[in-house]
Amino acid sequence: MGRLVVEEVRAAGVPLVGGIGGSDGVAPPDDVTRYADIAALAGASDLVIDFTHAEAVRAHAAALADAGTAWVLGTSGLSAAEEAAVATAAGRIAVVYAANFSAGVTLVLSLAERMAAVLPASAYDAEIVEMHHRQKVDAPSGTAIGIGRAVARGRGVALEDVIDSARHGHTGARRTGAIGFASLRGGQVVGEHTLIFAAADEQIALTHRGFDRRSFAAGAVRAALWAAGRGAGLFTMEDVLGLR
């Protein structure tokens, strides 16, 4: 993702200060200034676009908040403690947090909430199916969880109270109101998500397929341009696109 972000930043004509390598040892492109750590990068920048691993989020949150540097975060698979660190940082700086920055997925999230508000949980079972490349380490994907949260908001419930993502063996009948997840991994699939509302007499499906990670990088740069100079707060791509 880093190389695509660099290309999109330059295409937008925005000054690129530099970057740091991820915990997997991947370094920035050779023509990008490399900083020793997140604190050094934050001190030199107005805004940081971050696609590193979840384990780095708490340290990044503290360093960016201390430096007053805005943060566009696209790391998925965050724990409750890591999400809390993001929220704490958002009390001091502008944070745009999204598991997926593509405009298409953002529209899916908006539609999912609206559909869930109209289709009663007692009659329409909500299921989310996602597939990604074989190297992806977290499941369900952050985007799938985001879709689930959108459905839960539309229904006025907490996702944690209705999630069903561990079906195996004899599970018994489906719980009314549950939001189900199925995760597939294989090949080099960039990302595919389908939200299904299944009733006794009809089925509605909403699908997004990503074919190139460039859409994520372009969306992240769009979020960065929107967040630059903005006051503290926790924002999403729906805010960036003016959907709420």
Put a short name on every predicted segment.
Residues 10, 65, 120:
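Anion (oxyanion) recognition and catalysis
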Residues 52-53, 76, 183-185:
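Short glycine-/small-residue-rich Rossmann-like dinucleotide-binding loops
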